[in-house]
Amino acid sequence: MCDEDVAALVVDNGSGMCKAGFAGDDAPRAVFPSIVGRPRHQGVMVGMGQKDSYVGDEAQSKRGILTLKYPIEHGIVTNWDDMEKIWHHTFYNELRVAPEEHPVLLTEAPLNPKANREKMTQIMFETFNTPAMYVAIQAVLSLYASGRTTGIVMDSGDGVTHTVPIYEGYALPHAIMRLDLAGRDLTDYLMKILTERGYSFTTTAEREIVRDIKEKLCYVALDFEQEMQTASTSSSLEKSYELPDGQVITIGNERFRCPEAMFQPSFLGMEAAGIHETTYNSIMKCDVDIRKDLYANTVLSGGSTMFPGIADRMQKEITALAPPTMKIKIIAPPERKYSVWIGGSILASLSTFQQMWISKQEYDESGPSIVHRKCF
């Protein structure tokens, strides 16, 4: 089915960023925003080659004149036409490959609706004519990337956060928890609390500036109340940031108030458990015999786990919830921003995986539903 010399393509479609590259590589070649932009204004310069839509970095750089849309919301594809544009851009512009010559490994959110998975399969075979494809669950790939087959993955990206317990390579669906609170919500919250400080950020373009502030300056406090005290009495926690127009803004307690929402969703007006409690609840839904292995192998993954201080805080919070003698270990690999992609790269290059691909022939015989039989 697969010639040894043809590298498989690995595409991790996140709500915020798309990561793509070749199986066997240790990092994705292309990382670009999962954005499709359409002009807000009529083009007036004839012959400038203005397009009716822009994808990724190009959409990002022309954001001032475009309306930006994210086709993946909360980890699940909501706009298939735009998604197709993103895949087209991935293959032809970013990786510069012909998809009909390579097997493609795609990733999906845990608990992805069945119809979504079928639609992905259909587009790959019918629109892009791939010779073979596979759909893998993101959290499972993150665990592979950490060199484990058992553990619980707390995966938090831009659109959604999941806690996924995995035992001997199988995700335990009954214990998967989903929290619709992730990077994009934190960016929106930071926009809101910066507005209270008197800075105004409203447009989709300005939101990207705030996202940058979040990524560069925010951190998780080990003790939130204590940190608030420190911030109110001294200026030691203040940092400044230069906006694109040269204006400099100062931020203080917003630096840790923003990511604190992951532990206290009530900050966003949400009646949900924080990431520590969600992780604990997930573990408690598993068989009592495997909990010990999960506590000792709690793996963080995704861009929203990149805040400094998050691992220590998780350790502290889960220790407080768990039985007193339990050994708790939080694993935060430095490359966790891309661990889903790295796990996909590892999986797709394993010799034992080669018979797992769904081939074009199998698809033609069975149709899109083949994906439920072959990918689990």
Curated annotation (Swiss-Prot):
Gene3D superfamilies hit by this protein: 3.30.420.40, Actin, Chain A, domain 4
A GO term from the CC aspect: cytoplasm
Sites bearing N-acetylcysteine, chain numbering: C2
First-tier enzyme category under EC: hydrolase
Coiled coil: none
Record PTM N6-methyllysine, positions in chain: K85
Subcellular localization: Cytoplasm, Cytoskeleton
Sites of Tele-methylhistidine modification: H74
Modified residues (N-acetylaspartate): D3
Annotated EC: 3.6.4.-
InterPro entries per record: Actin (IPR004000), Actin/actin-like_CS (IPR020902), Actin_CS (IPR004001), ATPase_NBD (IPR043129)
Keyword terms of this UniProt record: Acetylation, ATP-binding, Cytoplasm, Cytoskeleton, Hydrolase, Methylation, Nucleotide-binding, Oxidation
Superkingdom of origin: Eukaryota
Function: Actins are highly conserved proteins that are involved in various types of cell motility and are ubiquitously expressed in all eukaryotic cells.
UniProt similarity note: Belongs to the actin family.
The protein, known as: Actin, cytoplasmic
Organism (species): Biomphalaria alexandrina (Bloodfluke planorb)
